[in-house]
């Protein structure tokens, strides 16, 4: 019996009742008009405001993206300039070091040549002094030997003439 009551109730709910349909439609229209007057404006306004907020966020995101891309390009340009500048500084440093090395080498070679020339001059001067000393000693020995041989002492001018002629004879014989 309980089951037959449920079936009757379900049947009455599913069967159309024209009065109920009329009043349901009128109630729906009234609620719709009330919602249009009261809630439709704020809902549409909220949706439009939400749309504007979303569009604003999208615009800000696009501008932030463009700005970040511009900053990235600028940073890449600055990095490229810094690389070029560092390469230039390194190249200039190497050039300066090469030039400095060449200058130092040139100065050292020049100093070495000067020292060699000075040493040669000093050797030549010492050689001349030694030859002069040797000539004087040879002249003295020659005079003493000649004195012993001829048993007479020669005066200074005569000795000088004899020594000079002997030295010239020796010089011509050597050359």
Swiss-Prot record:
The chain crosses the membrane at residues 20-40. The keyword Transmembrane helix applies. It is a single-pass membrane protein. Keywords: ATP synthesis, Cell inner membrane, Cell membrane, CF(0), Hydrogen ion transport, Ion transport, Membrane, Transmembrane, Transmembrane helix, Transport. It comes from the Bacteria. The keyword DNA-binding does not apply. CDD domains: ATP-synt_Fo_b. One of its GO terms (cellular component) is proton-transporting ATP synthase complex. One of its GO terms (molecular function) is proton-transporting ATP synthase activity, rotational mechanism. PANTHER family: ATP SYNTHASE SUBUNIT B (PTHR33445:SF1), ATP SYNTHASE SUBUNIT B', CHLOROPLASTIC (PTHR33445). Belongs to the ATPase B chain family. This is ATP synthase subunit b.
């Amino acid at each position: 019996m309980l089951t037959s009551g449920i079936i009757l109730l379900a049947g009455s709910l599913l069967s159309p009742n024209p009065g109920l349909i009329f009043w349901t439609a009128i109630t729906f229209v009234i609620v719709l008009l009330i919602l249009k007057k009261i809630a439709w404006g704020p809902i549409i306004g909220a949706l439009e405001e939400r749309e504007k907020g979303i569009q604003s966020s999208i615009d800000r995101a696009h501008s932030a993206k463009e700005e970040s891309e511009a900053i990235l390009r600028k940073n890449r340009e600055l990095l490229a300039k810094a690389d070029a500048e560092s390469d230039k500084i390194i190249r200039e440093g190497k050039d300066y070091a090469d030039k400095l090395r060449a200058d130092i080498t040139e100065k050292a070679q020049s100093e070495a040549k000067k020292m060699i020339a000075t040493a040669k001059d000093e050797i030549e001067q010492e050689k001349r002094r030694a030859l002069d000393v040797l000539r004087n000693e040879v002249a003295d020995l020659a005079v003493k030997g000649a004195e012993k041989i001829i048993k007479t002492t020669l005066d200074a001018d005569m000795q000088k003439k004899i020594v000079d002629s002997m030295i010239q004879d020796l010089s011509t014989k050597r050359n």
